[in-house]
Design a protein with these regions (language model features):
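Metal-dependent catalytic cores of enzymes that make or break cyclic nucleotides
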Residues: 1-192
Length: 195
């Protein structure tokens, strides 16, 4: 069982997008830009995910990661349009890590950014999209080399390594290969809810 704040962060990093399971494949797997109506459906994934894990005792501490990871510092995020310190810190932290991962991950329609360019994007968006404190902390961890070393060690496509073990960013930078683990956990959650 996962215990403690670091464990909750690790599990939150893995499960934050679990609600996408409830999004129709025609939207979730679409390679072109989503229509406005489709985007409104996609924006429901934090609430869908929160409903999936609600009531499962050992997952209660990860609810803020799931529910608030799309809220932006300037209030233009979703699902509730919270801003600044209205957003639980788990959501503010995960947004920075998830954005870095998204920017540096190659997609079918674009190559991933060089990590240094992604760091610059975080810097430019702090105080707008991201909590300035967490951007600064992320950049400090980056400059110390622990994040870069871990990404090099894992080839960017593996589970976060021991190099991030003591960083608050540990396991919040999750590659898309973690989706398989997420789906396995989702199946267990659904089975537990049915019992």
């Amino acid at each position: 069982m996962v215990r403690g704040r670091a464990g909750h962060g690790q599990l939150g990093g893995i499960l934050h997008d679990i609600g996408k399971i409830g999004i129709p494949d025609s939207i979730f797997l679409k390679s072109e830009k989503l229509a406005d109506e489709e985007w409104q459906i996609m924006k429901q994934h934090p609430e869908i995910g929160a409903k999936m894990v609600a009531g499962i005792d050992f997952l209660e501490p990860v609810l803020p990661y799931i529910l608030y990871h799309q809220e932006r510092w300037d209030g233009h995020g979703y699902p509730y349009g919270l801003k600044q310190n209205e957003i639980p810190e788990e959501g503010r932290l995960l947004l920075v890590c998830d954005a870095f991962d998204a920017m540096t991950t190659t997609r079918p329609y674009r190559n991933g950014l060089d990590p240094e360019l992604a760091i610059e994007e975080l810097r430019q968006r702090k105080g707008i999209q991201f909590d300035p404190m967490y951007v600064n902390e992320f950049i400090t961890a980056w400059k110390k080399g622990s994040i870069l070393d871990a990404l090099k060690e894992q080839g960017k496509e593996q589970q976060p390594s021991r190099a991030l073990q003591y960083s608050k960013f540990q396991s919040l930078i999750i590659s898309k290969n973690e989706m398989q683990k997420e789906l396995e956990v989702a199946k267990k959650i659904l089975n537990q809810k049915r019992e």
